[in-house]
Amino acid sequence: MKFLTTGLLATAALAAAQEQQVLQAEDGHGQAPQRDASIFDETLQKFQSSLEDGISHFWSEMKTNFKDYLPLISLPKKHTRRPDSEWDHVVRGADIESVWVQGADGEKRREIDGKLHNYDLRVKAVDPSKLGVDPGVKQYSGYLDDNDADKHLFYWFFESRNDPKNDPVVLWLNGGPGCSSLTGLFLELGPATIDKNLKVVSNPYSWNSNASVIFLDQPVNVGFSYSGSSVSDTVAAGKDVYALLTLFFKQFPEYASQDFHISGESYAGHYIPVFAAEILSHKNTNINLKSALIGNGLTDPLTQYPQYRPMACGEGGYPAVLDQGTCRSMDNSLERCLSLIETCYSSESAWVCVPAAMYCNSAILAPYQQTGMNPYDVRTKCEDMASLCYPQLNAITEWLNQESVMQALGVEVQSYESCNSGINRDFLFHGDWMKPYHRLVPSVLEKIPVLIYAGDADFICNWLGNLAWTDALEWPGHKKFAEAKLEDLKIVNNKDKGKKIGQVKSSGNFTFMRIFGAGHMVPLNQPEASLEFFNRWLGGEWH
């Protein structure tokens, strides 16, 4: 079995062969597509001979148990592309790439850096009255098209409720990999949610209360996005995000002049260091990146995986979920897990990073999964595994699949799903899961502040692990940050002034927050507290 998360599709038991069930991709008739087993065998044999014995063993297990179930790429979505004439705006990346200006030194240079000629951006002005989502607030939806690779990323933009001419712009990314950011929109921090009767309910604590927010379905084939190809690693996805922002701000220069922040949760702990580094690598850009925020992220597996046992066994501030025997078993498995992750860090090759993910997720994550407790909140049982332990997702999915909704948004796929297991599988089997993307954070910290926040009831990307990797990160401010003490985080902006909502430590450009009483999705469990620290962060506090 494997458990799906709104932020992390933890393939928790891929290596536990006897008890596993792998979610199979189906063709249009409900049958698993045929695989070319001979090619699969030859590929594994070619590389197995050069691997260490332990790693080779895991590839042998995968070859035996999973070759008939795992496609090498996720299947494309059925879609119908709308003609450009049906869109309110179409921005051509080639037009942007062709603009040259003269610098102060007299030399000619491109106005905006980056490979953009293959990208277009299609924009639809959404009529809020048709959907009932934040009536009166300006909204846009559409697609970023990579015409060379046949990739089409869906986005939905909400202007700030407060002062859109001056408020910052924020990009929100859910994780997975393979989960739609519309989950974040309707379940967590967006302007509305959907009740069990499919009625739109306003969210007074939406993050667009004082900021304009872009919700992006990425990588391709997630949510309303689609493609004839696939993206199976974080670095490739970063190029698409840079193009989206560049073309969006070119179409809407009124937002380009404002501060921009990139935010997300869970597997976005992989995405955001890469995406921020990609943006910052361009000297001439129209993206005014000011900070990055990661909530309950997976960023440094080598440092975070040792904290799963303490969190599950009563050392994270909540009662133990696992018995002492299971806790000892996790301890006994940890050394081998960390050895595999270290090898992955050294090589960054899929042929060693995949076995690390398979073994560690089976030995370290699966014991918790088998209890039936919610992996995103140690306080509760998992109500419905099919809906990722949150039945509210069923109503959100049903609402988004209505023809009237898809028509209003300009959607080009036939259906919406909150998470795509095929994308998760692609990233896993390309070795992305265990790669050391935290190594990019120091270079990001040189230029912008970074906030790592964590709901303290989450298991899957728990606060202990996030505190551990931020304390361990090697950067010029490492010593001062590691020595800084956690201090009370209190509400300062409303009637609950003085109420403790968590703990915070900060030094230089780096800040860590523990949010009390929140699981994996902080804005869902603590909406008031999340908007409090979000607004204060955007306002410049702690940096």
Curated annotation (Swiss-Prot):
InterPro entries per the UniProt record, alphabetical: AB_hydrolase_fold, Peptidase_S10, Ser_caboxypep_ser_AS
The record describes the protein's role as: Vacuolar carboxypeptidase involved in degradation of small peptides. Digests preferentially peptides containing an aliphatic or hydrophobic residue in P1' position, as well as methionine, leucine or phenylalanine in P1 position of ester substrate.
Chain positions listed as propeptide in the UniProt record: 18-124
- Which protein family is it in? Belongs to the peptidase S10 family.
Quote the cellular component terms of the Gene Ontology held in the record.
Answer: fungal-type vacuole
Pfam families of this UniProt entry?
Answer: Peptidase_S10 (PF00450)
* Reaction(s) the record says it catalyses: Release of a C-terminal amino acid with broad specificity
Q: According to its UniProt record, where is this protein located?
A: Vacuole
Q: What is this protein called?
A: Carboxypeptidase Y homolog A
According to its UniProt entry, one GO biological process term is: proteolysis
Task: Give the UniProt keywords, A-Z.
Answer: Carboxypeptidase, Disulfide bond, Glycoprotein, Hydrolase, Protease, Signal, Vacuole, Zymogen
Annotated coiled-coil positions are: none
